[in-house]
Amino acid sequence: MNERDMSLMDHIAELRRRILIIVVFFVIALVVGFFLATPMITYLQGAPTAQDLPMNAFKLTDPLRVYMTFAFTSAFILVFPIILYQLWAFVSPGLHENERKATLAYIPIAFFLFLGGLSFAYFILFPFLIQFIGGLAERLHINELYGINEYFTFLFQITMPFGVLFQLPVVVMFLTRLGIVTPEFLRSVRKYAFFVLLVVAGFITPPELISHLMVTVPLLLLYEFSIWVSHLTYRKVQKLEKLRQEEYRQEEG
């Protein structure tokens, strides 16, 4: 087996090890999630968006499904920083020392952005959508009778994607640090990125202009913010590269 094959096998073994660590931590977090599920469900049932909505179990398994969904979602949120760290640990051997330190700092930023995306969707977007749907049902003279599983499924469909979408600035920072993307590239594909974000917003929201704008505008601003972040990161990378080249010339001289 040549050196290239050994290197490939080493990468595969390292990837398996990182995945195993994530699985172990997820199982531990899932146990914690089983304890968190009930108080979280009780709290969200008492929230303003749910107080006036009669919730019913239309299937025998609905309470169990809701409970397990909350347990797994709680586990994912708890283990999210671990996932980010294991991803960083997998790629960090290929980075310079200063790059490793810089990218390690992205993990808490990414986690807080994830929580920020969840908060934006839950406290701003979700109440508006519930109000819009309730108003539409009233205008159409439709009696609202929601299942608890349907309500919380809709809640997760709105909130969880925003937690992921709010990772865009961190992903852009990381890719810029690795030299994969540049601010110029992000600007050149802006119109295509905007189109993709419009499509994503269309999948998340109901077919109504105001709710669509409430999702689309933050996503477009997030992309523009990512370009600015990429610009700052790119400048730092260029400066470090110049310093590295100067040090190399001095050593050669």
Curated annotation (Swiss-Prot):
Gene name, Swiss-Prot/TrEMBL: tatC
Function text: Part of the twin-arginine translocation (Tat) system that transports large folded proteins containing a characteristic twin-arginine motif in their signal peptide across membranes.
Coiled coil residues, start to end: none
PROSITE patterns registered for this protein in UniProt: TATC
UniProt record, GO biological process: intracellular protein transmembrane transport; protein transport by the Tat complex
Membrane topology: Multi-pass membrane protein
GO molecular function: proton motive force dependent protein transmembrane transporter activity
Subcellular location: Cell membrane
Oligomeric and partner information: Forms a complex with TatA.
Xref: NCBIfam families: tatC
Alphabetized UniProt keyword annotations: Cell membrane, Membrane, Protein transport, Translocation, Transmembrane, Transmembrane helix, Transport
Family: Belongs to the TatC family.
Gene Ontology annotations for the cellular component aspect, listed alphabetically: TAT protein transport complex
Chain segments annotated as transmembrane: 19-39, 70-90, 109-129, 154-174, 194-214
Protein name per UniProt: Sec-independent protein translocase protein TatC
